[in-house]
Amino acid sequence: PVIIPPVADSTVIINTLEHLDGLILTGGGDHNPLWMGEEPSPRLHNINQERDAAELMLVRLAFNRQIPMLGICRGIQTLAIALGGKVYQDIKQMVKHSQDADRSEPTHSVEIKKDSTLYHIYNSEKILVNSFHHQAVSEPGRHMRIIAKSTDGIIEAIESNEYKQILGVQWHPEWLGEEGGKIFQWLVNQAGNFHAAKQLHKRILTLDTHCDTPMFFPQGVKFDHRDSRILVDLHKMTDGHQDATTMVAYLPQPKIGESFSSKVAFDVQGPLQYADLIFDKIEEIVSKNRDYLSIARTPADLYSDKRKGRKSIMLGIENGLALEHDLSNVKYFAQRGVVYITLCHNGDNDICDSARGCNTHN
């Protein structure tokens, strides 16, 4: 096991996460409500800004990397805040949530949803837990869902609603002997699966054969910056251990009477020039990130880049409109490094009918 100190340097955290297969977020003091845009309640207890900042960053980075996570007590609250949720600064208690009994003594019940990871772990809709908290999750955030509550409605457990292996519980299973150990066994199993997946990625090459990121170039996206508007960027490729992607120059198909220039955001004379412009922009991205990116044209290039620790970009064209009725342009684009050209896309053209077209030729 690795104990991670409260480190503010994201590079240190990222490098640490590269060596981890699972993450436990432990109990502790209150969170600073300023993280949630709230002013402090008079009933707020001790806070630790340094720990808050480090753990919130840690969760977000681990989330992006699909690392299995278990949050305990404060840890469930850390999960919620980091992933867009909120926490009550001090709960109104109908059930005693800060017991005086021994830590190993369960003192109240928790009702569990049947379609949840927690139900799969315990095979029961109700379990008994211990309780040592005055704060609790109020909103799980858009990435998480509520899977267990106490009888007074306090959220006792949340999990990912995106099929990520993330679970948070408000109680302390580490004090509950064999019953509590079941949750830790779940994390061990998920960490084992994650480790196996990472080892698989080391042995094989993963190639995304189609990426629409260039469609967003007119909106100012940068491939070397994490951007929620696009599904593939350099950071997401790294997080997901993806080795290569094929960036396509998508050419919209004008209808009869429409000009091509009216369908695209850049000022170009025709489809070929537009495709060239997209490829120029991709090559500019690669040129600025040579330590991390390379243009690949062959399988040998792909495997060479993987050995060198670089991500590969291959080039493609979506819509044979780019050929401009000249078959010699097939050779031209091949020499530019284009690895495939689809004959059409979402409309009939002079080459063929589209599956979504109007049967122009047939």
Language model: regions and residue ranges:
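Glycine/threonine-rich flexible loop motifs
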Residues: 33-48
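A short helix->loop->beta-strand "cap" motif at the edges of active sites that frequently abuts
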Residues: 65-67, 311
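Amide-donor transfer/coupling interface in amidating biosynthetic enzymes
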Residues: 2-21, 25, 48-65, 92-199
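Alpha-helix-loop-beta-strand connector modules within alpha/beta enzyme cores
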Residues: 55, 360-362
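Gly/Ala-rich beta-loop-alpha elbow adjacent to hydrolase catalytic centers
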Residues: 71, 75, 80, 84
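Non-cysteine beta-strand/loop elements that form the S-adenosyl-L-methionine
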Residues: 22-30, 89, 339-346
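N-terminal hydrophobic targeting/anchoring segments and the immediately downstream early-domain regions
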Residues: 196-360
